[in-house]
Amino acid sequence: MSESSSQARLAIVCGLPGSGKTTLAIRLEAEYGAVRFSPDDWMDDLGINLHDTAARAKIERLQWKLAQKLLATGGKVVIEWGTWARAERDALRTAARELGAAVELHYLQAEEDVLFERISRRGRENPPIPRKAIAEWKYLFEAPTSDELAPFDEPLLQD
């Protein structure tokens, strides 16, 4: 194993619902021997509605505390939060780097029809997500630019 693959590593998986984050995050978890943090999974397990933003924020804070402990001891972590804002991605990168971790960003995107079809097929949302919400999300989501991607490390596993 090379030095870059044996050091602590944070993989941030970013994108809108239905973009394939969970599929990629599970793959990264297996390939890297990482711990994957997904608020959706925890909320499902705890019987919390996925639209409960206060609970989601608390879960993400707890997940980040655990992730930092893992990174500080040389572990590998996959964050599957969506990370819609550049400021959030920058903060994760900065904090992980301060712990000596390499940090990679995986940005996933898909057409609105594909996002809607995937979200509808999985049927996790209650109430169901209306199609118009996806257009609103695309407007709110800050897609990573080449400028933002530059300070991230090269992913060990390509998307």
Set out the residue ranges of the language-model regions.
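Pocket-edge positions in alpha/beta enzyme catalytic cores
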Residues: H51, A55, W84, N126-I129
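A structural preference for long, well-packed, hydrophobic secondary-structure segments
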Residues: V13-S19, R27-L28, H51, R86-A91, ...
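Conserved substrate/cofactor phosphate-moiety recognition/catalytic segment
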Residues: S19-G75, E117, R121
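Glycine-rich loops and low-complexity Gly/Arg-rich segments
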Residues: R36-S38, E60-Q63, A102-L105, I129-A133
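Conserved GTP-binding G-domain of TRAFAC-class P-loop NTPases and closely related GTPase folds
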Residues: S2-C14, S19-T22, R27, E31, ...
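Conserved Rossmann-like nucleotide-binding pocket used by diverse enzymes
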Residues: I12, F37, I79, H106
